[in-house]
Amino acid sequence: MSQAELEQGVGDILIGEEELQARIRELGAELSVDYAGREVLLVGVLKGAVFFMADLMRSLTIPCEIDFMAISSYGASTDSSGVVRILKDLDINIEGRHVLVVEDIVDSGLTLSYLMRNLESREPASLEVCALLTKPTRREIDVPVRYIGFEIPNRFVIGYGLDFAERYRNLPYVGVLHPDLMPEGV
């Protein structure tokens, strides 16, 4: 798929590249202050958080390590099934560690709630969430997200790690999927 074909899939640009990067630098500065004197373990939630985590990590001025988890509640559809599965677990023991979960988007909160309970049972010293995007109107369960990049409306977003059918992740901005490509019922 060419860049032109990718961009044809975008209805609107919701958050431009410069705005994204500026906010990520702000989050990095805030995290660097909040975690000063401590080493933080960034846990990226695959696949969507890869771009955000890489840029966030580069903006930090504190020691950090990274690890990844892959979890799913979507299967092959665009709506959460409510059944959460761990597809890839952590390689690092988090007991006694300061853990920051890095998420691309918090939607219903169901998947993140499951993940937080799972990680909390491993007895980290601290456990917080940093999400690039949150859709508060979609929340079905209250999950504390301490660090938020942007609150967005309930629209199907793509780009900057977010996909539709594994496409559009590599766009440098967050866009809205073109209405002609929107799955029924979304």
Placement of each model-derived feature along the sequence:
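PRPP-associated nucleotide enzymes
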Residues: 1-186
